[in-house]
Amino acid sequence: MTRRQDGTGQGRVAVVTGGGTGIGRATARALAADGARVLVVGRTAATLERTAAGHQGVRTLVADLTDDDAPERITSAALDAFGRLDVLVHNAAVVLPEPFGAVTREHARLQVETNLLAPVLLTRAALPALAAARGTVVAVGTAAVQGRRAFAGMSLYGATKTALDFLVRTWAVELAPWGVRAVGVAPGETDTGIGERMGWSAADIARHQAEAAARTPSGRVGRPEDVSWWVVRLARPEGAYANGAVVTVDGGASVV
């Protein structure tokens, strides 16, 4: 269910990467409900179309963020479709859990290129357009729980998310002369459907979520809409004094 917004995003344009499922889908829909026009980017046309279905002003672009031409393609697609770019949401991520001794070069490269290098290069490509709009970069997944605690099998994923957190803080300083600000949202355990996509059984998913809920003061795992609500508000012009901030949305899991 998409939470109702109040329309203060009217006229703005946003790009959301990883917009085909989970938090990315919820964010694209929430931005559209807030009045923004949105370009959702992902690798699978069918999931992107499901995100856009029933939401006027949402367009889709199939792109692999690790392709050399992806940053320019995405930026050009947004400008060609809407004429401006106000909000860039970095949401796409790859997680490949495996013991450190089993990490392959291919898996390491894929996580680093998708989770870290892609936001760097896309932000660089979009910077002139963002500067023209005095826009905002929002990084989702910055130093989430996996980036603050040690979890076996999650070393590379956690490292990329911690690095993204540092990028947000550095961008706040470096992009300020351009009139562009950077903020982050750090979700805790969120029911994004990733378990199903990774082939987990229903019993394994239920057990994992029950364990996560038990570790969380709020007593449940998050919903994608819990996270997208914060993305929308941080991206609004009214939130412009938030710069370099990373908001943790984890039900209190990181404080226990």
Tell what function each PLM region has:
Residues 91-96, 252:
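Conserved NAD(P)H cofactor-binding loop of Rossmann-fold oxidoreductase domains
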Residues 53, 177, 189-216:
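A glycine/serine/threonine-rich, flexible loop-to-helix segment
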Residues 99-100, 107-112, 212:
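Substrate-binding pocket helix/loop in short-chain dehydrogenase/reductase
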Residues 120, 129, 220-249, 254:
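C-terminal substrate-recognition "lid" of short-chain dehydrogenase/reductases
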Residues 136-163, 168-177, 189:
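Catalytic loop of short-chain dehydrogenase/reductase
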Residues 89, 176, 181, 242-244:
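Short, small/polar-rich loop/turn modules that mediate ligand/substrate recognition or access, typified
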